[in-house]
């Protein structure tokens, strides 16, 4: 199954070694029609800063596939009363973002922005704040969130975080970063594999599987304190944790009674309860947002396919029928769809299926994708794809129209998962 090894209920990837420091470069490609034409004018005063706020906002919005960026060459940010709306109308913009950056006496930076309706020539919203240089990127994501929500009526997901595993040389590191891969920091590092990270619903903890004890054990780690606890260390293999929507329970995969089966435990590791009963391998559980269903991968029918069963157990319903290899299901936050990996003509691609129509759509056309998960606003999907023998972070819009690649100069990135929406302070 091309580099995948079905082992103790886990799809364990055999990683290749890499070394040296990593740098990030964003590449966005693809796109469709019926997008909102928006111009993001260069912010006054941002030249010379280590990061361009207008460039970050532009990349955020373009990555969703819902916006068409209008050329701003030769035009700059101005105060609303000075703006020549006819110039922006001539370039096809229906919305315009302008802003300014200026230094403050205490060393911080004052950032201001406005979102304008080019057609009606009115201001839709505005925002300002004083930040440090290190906070510029987060503030730019906040601006993009405000623009996105104002124009679409949906919350933006640009201020969220992701988790992933990075292998460099013989070292495995569980890392957390901004949603676009920047500002990564390591939670733990070991010379043994770390796999299947899963965010708690409130974003305060991450469950994951570590092989540091020479066998797979499930841990839960608190991000703020870095304290962790082994919550599934039963006889045999313990793997593939998934949080219930209320954060009180975890679904895990154990070989406690022989084959790999799905169990429920409380978030502290107590209250073990067996859920699946099959002669095959059941693995990779995912809770439905309402907490009623578990979707999972099983080879009970002879090939890896995706099934769904009540969280209390019972009869499993097969969900995928196209092809002989469908794995790694992940529910959308609204519960209407699920995303997974589908083998297509020897390629492993991200696919999405509508639960009401059962229609499947391929979203990617690369060779080897894995670990898809939705953004918390349903609009984007995070996954890793293999290029040149190493995994890199990528996103695709949920309609498949816009793809974004975060290229790492070094390091092998796998097991990516998107975190929940965070409350704005």
Swiss-Prot record:
Would you tell me the Gene Ontology cellular component terms?
periplasmic space
* InterPro entries for this protein: 6-blade_b-propeller_TolB-like, PD40, Tol-Pal_TolB, TolB_N
Q: Which UniProt keywords apply?
A: Cell cycle, Cell division, Periplasm, Signal
Which cysteines pair up through disulfides? They are: none
Entry superkingdom? Bacteria
Annotated localization:
Periplasm
Listed under GO biological process in this entry are: cell division; protein import
Q: Does the keyword Ligase apply?
A: no
What is the annotated signal peptide range for this record? 1-22
The family note in this entry says:
Belongs to the TolB family.
> What does the annotation say about its assembly with partners?
The Tol-Pal system is composed of five core proteins: the inner membrane proteins TolA, TolQ and TolR, the periplasmic protein TolB and the outer membrane protein Pal. They form a network linking the inner and outer membranes and the peptidoglycan layer.
Record PANTHER family: PROTEIN TOLB (PTHR36842:SF1), PROTEIN TOLB HOMOLOG (PTHR36842)
Role = Part of the Tol-Pal system, which plays a role in outer membrane invagination during cell division and is important for maintaining outer membrane integrity.
- NCBIfam families referenced in this protein's UniProt entry, alphabetically: propeller_TolB
Protein name as catalogued: Tol-Pal system protein TolB
Taxonomy of the source species: Bacteria, Pseudomonadati, Pseudomonadota, Betaproteobacteria, Nitrosomonadales
């Amino acid at each position: 199954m091309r580099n995948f090894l079905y082992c103790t209920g886990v799809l364990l990837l055999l990683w290749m070694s890499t070394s040296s420091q990593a740098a990030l470069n964003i590449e966005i490609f693809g796109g469709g029609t019926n997008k909102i034409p928006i111009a993001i004018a260069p912010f006054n005063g941002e030249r010379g800063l280590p990061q361009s706020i207008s460039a970050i906002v532009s990349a955020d919005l373009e990555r969703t596939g819902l916006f068409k960026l209008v050329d701003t060459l030769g035009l700059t940010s101005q105060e609303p009363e000075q703006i020549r709306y006819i110039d922006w109308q001539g370039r096809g913009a229906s919305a315009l973002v302008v802003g300014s950056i200026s230094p403050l006496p205490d060393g911080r930076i004052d950032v201001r922005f406005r979102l304008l309706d080019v057609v009606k020539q009115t201001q839709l919203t505005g925002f300002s704040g004083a930040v440090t240089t290190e906070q510029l990127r987060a503030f730019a994501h906040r601006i993009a969130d405000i623009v996105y929500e104002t124009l679409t009526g949906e919350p933006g997901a640009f201020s969220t975080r992701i988790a992933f595993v990075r292998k460099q040389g013989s070292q495995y590191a569980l890392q957390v970063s901004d949603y676009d891969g920047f500002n990564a920091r390591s939670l733990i590092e070991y010379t043994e594999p770390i796999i299947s990270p899963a965010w708690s619903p409130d974003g305060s903890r991450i469950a994951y599987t570590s092989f540091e004890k020479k066998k797979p054990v499930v841990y839960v780690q608190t991000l703020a304190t870095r304290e962790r606890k082994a919550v599934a260390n039963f006889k045999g293999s313990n793997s593939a944790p998934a949080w219930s929507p209320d954060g009180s329970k975890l679904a895990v995969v154990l070989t406690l009674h022989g084959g790999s089966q799905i169990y429920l435990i409380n978030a502290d590791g107590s209250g073990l309860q067996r859920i699946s009963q099959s002669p095959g391998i059941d693995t990779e559980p995912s809770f439905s947002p309402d907490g009623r269903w578990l979707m999972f991968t099983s080879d009970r029918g002879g090939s890896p396919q995706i099934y769904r069963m009540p969280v209390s157990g019972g009869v499993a319903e097969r969900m995928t029928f196209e092809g002989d290899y469908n794995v790694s299901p992940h529910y959308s936050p609204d519960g209407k769809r699920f995303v997974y990996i589908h083998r297509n003509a020897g390629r492993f691609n991200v696919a999405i299926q509508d639960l009401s129509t059962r229609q499947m759509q391929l979203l990617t056309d690369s060779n080897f994708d894995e670990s898809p998960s939705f953004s918390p606003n349903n609009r984007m999907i995070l996954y890793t794809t293999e290029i040149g023998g190493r995994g890199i972070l990528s996103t695709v819009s949920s309609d498949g129209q816009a793809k974004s690649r975060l290229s790492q100069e070094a390091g092998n990135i796998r097991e990516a998962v998107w975190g929940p929406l965070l409350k704005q302070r």
